[in-house]
A protein has these predicted regions:
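Mature catalytic core of soluble alpha/beta enzymes
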Residues: 1-187
């Protein structure tokens, strides 16, 4: 976590390279695969922009165009090298695994439950819901998708088994300045 001074992510961001745990290396490799498949639409090097806009510190602000252009110089998943447990970043780059960490965590929780002999479960990590098996009565799990325009309503319900349902929206992490809403989903 970028908010934890002792985390692998913080150490890599501070030093530009180093050895990480097997688990962090696994998550980073998975993130790199997703980045490649999405042609960079998902990119763990987004951290400089998240920090610039204040989403990492809650000191929100609209940065100048020149600041954004400067931060963008370090944003590209191709600036990350993962070789075993060794990670290196190109100068000016820094990472944030927040976009993949909850999904990984819910998968690990499900695996631990399976290893303990549990046959039916739903794990809800707020925006990340993962289910395995069916409900105990044999029916599918039902997962509601929140309506971003109305906190107490939903857009629809998915019936599913053995799947993850992951959502993210600008209605949870955002700030307003001069009548304009700015959210944490950055393109």
């Amino acid at each position: 976590s970028v908010g934890n001074a002792d985390s692998d992510v913080t150490k890599i961001n501070e030093n530009g390279s180093g050895e990480v745990s097997e688990e962090t290396a696994f998550i980073m490799n998975r993130a790199m695969q997703v980045s490649e498949k999405t042609n960079g639409a998902f990119d763990i090097t987004i951290y400089p922009l998240m920090e610039l806009w204040g989403f990492t510190t809650k000191n929100y602000r609209v940065p100048e165009s020149s600041e954004i252009a400067e931060a963008l110089k370090g944003v590209s998943y191709t600036n990350v090298s993962v070789n075993g447990q060794q990670v290196a970043l190109t100068s000016g780059s820094s990472i944030d695994l927040g976009g993949i960490a909850k999904g990984y965590t819910s998968s690990r929780v499900i695996q631990i439950m399976k290893d303990c002999g549990i046959e039916h479960a739903i794990v809800n990590l707020g925006g990340n819901v993962q289910v395995f098996g069916t409900k105990t009565d044999g029916s599918d799990w039902r997962v509601a998708i929140q309506n971003p325009a109305s906190e107490n309503s939903y857009l629809g319900i998915l019936s599913t088994t053995d799947k993850a349902v992951i959502t993210s929206g600008g209605y949870e992490r955002y700030f307003e300045q001069d009548g304009q809403v700015y959210h944490h989903i950055i393109d």
